[in-house]
């Protein structure tokens, strides 16, 4: 019942673009979740991440489980394709990927600009998340969906093209030269 009060206070994230101010911050959203969600749902809420661990951890939320699987597979497909492009080996535990996911990963790997590749991947992630959107807009699963969508929108807004390009070049040069100096910087 409490999620009704929570969700009714949330502004819509639909139609938000890069120039539109966000109607809510992660901090405010977290405050509302801590206030209205039960302990079990709060535990699941704390496990929402844009970077799930490589080895899957069982969660009770179907939405979070599907998100984690999709994001993990996307990251593994990207790593595999990037490694192939550089002539390196990559251990992916004989992972098989869907055709759509592989096509998205191939497209992202072929985009020259890292910033444009990230924008493409962010759109792919938002589209994937939309396929997971719960039918019941007043459920705990919808709260988790909303949290993931807010995190994705905030993530792309944090990108700074100039510093990102410099960091990318540093890491790329380090990898191509076979050293690990990017880790210490």
Name each model feature, range by range.
Residues 1-185:
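Extended alpha-helical surfaces
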């Amino acid at each position: 019942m409490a999620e009704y009060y929570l969700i009714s206070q949330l502004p819509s994230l639909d139609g938000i673009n890069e120039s539109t101010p966000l109607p809510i911050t992660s901090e405010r959203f977290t405050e509302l979740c801590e206030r209205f969600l039960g302990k079990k749902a709060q535990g699941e809420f704390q496990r929402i991440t844009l970077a799930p661990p490589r080895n899957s951890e069982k969660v009770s939320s179907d939405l979070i489980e599907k998100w984690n699987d999709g994001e993990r597979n996307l990251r593994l497909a990207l790593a595999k394709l990037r490694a192939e492009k550089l002539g390196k080996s990559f251990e992916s535990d004989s992972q098989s990927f869907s055709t759509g996911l592989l096509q998205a990963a191939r497209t992202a790997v072929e985009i020259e600009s890292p910033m444009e590749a990230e924008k493409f991947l962010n759109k792919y992630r938002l589209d994937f998340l939309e396929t997971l959107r719960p039918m019941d807009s007043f459920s705990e699963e919808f709260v988790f969906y909303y949290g993931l969508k807010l995190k994705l929108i905030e993530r792309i807004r944090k990108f700074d093209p100039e510093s990102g390009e410099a960091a990318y070049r540093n890491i790329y040069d380090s990898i191509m030269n076979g050293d690990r100096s990017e880790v210490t910087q």
